């Protein structure tokens, strides 16, 4: 497999003429996120710092909404105050909450994120995956749509009939599909049941994105070429991230490597989620090649790492509109 190293252009914003949010609407473009919602409570030195609605796909969709991309979120939440906060947060950031399935008498999920000395997060989740259900309104997906999905929500057997059916409908409609593996250590015991579902998801996707940590848990592999040897059976394009180390993009034509600039971090919560959002944003805006798309993805990821929050900053949003 050939390996090529790329460097980022000095000014990503000069690569193309941006599509405005009005033009997104004219073209009928929409990003549909499918994933869980949680209330993220961030801790530093064991003290709570911030509470904000989150979830992997949710974080991506909020950032895309802030950037002016028409979005909708397919998820579920309790019929409690946290669920109210979640739906309001979606709408405040320009994301449709029409497809949020609310369950009266059920508590919304909560996540505690403890930041270490490197500002990397260790998580404790308070949620019952077996009680999750999806019996609400679902979107009609068309070829004009992009679909982002991932995490355990995408392989949870309790809701697989609904989620799997929606993904197959998206594939048949000709939507562009991006799968974020985001497989956590606490689900290793579920692998015999969920690995076939994860690989089915890969087969439905145009792009698979995962970290070396994800695939270490999923396949017991750390080597990039070995990982692509598994993923490439199902999807032609794999984006492999590795924290602060270089991003690698694998295709049948070979592997390209993109160094990641070093930055001072405040929190790495949402780093991968906003990488996904930036890549999708660049793709929808017609960025011409992987170099420019990965550069924009890294720019979004780094922006969220410089703050205590899950989504891109107003400053980045303003820079996209120039």
Where are these regions (language model features)?
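Conserved post-catalytic alpha-helical subdomain immediately downstream of the catalytic base
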Residues: 237, 259-322
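Low-acidity, Ser/Thr- and Arg-rich intrinsically disordered low-complexity segments
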Residues: 2-6
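Short, conserved phosphate/pyrophosphate- and ester-handling motifs at nucleotide-, phospho-/glycolipid
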Residues: 64, 211, 272
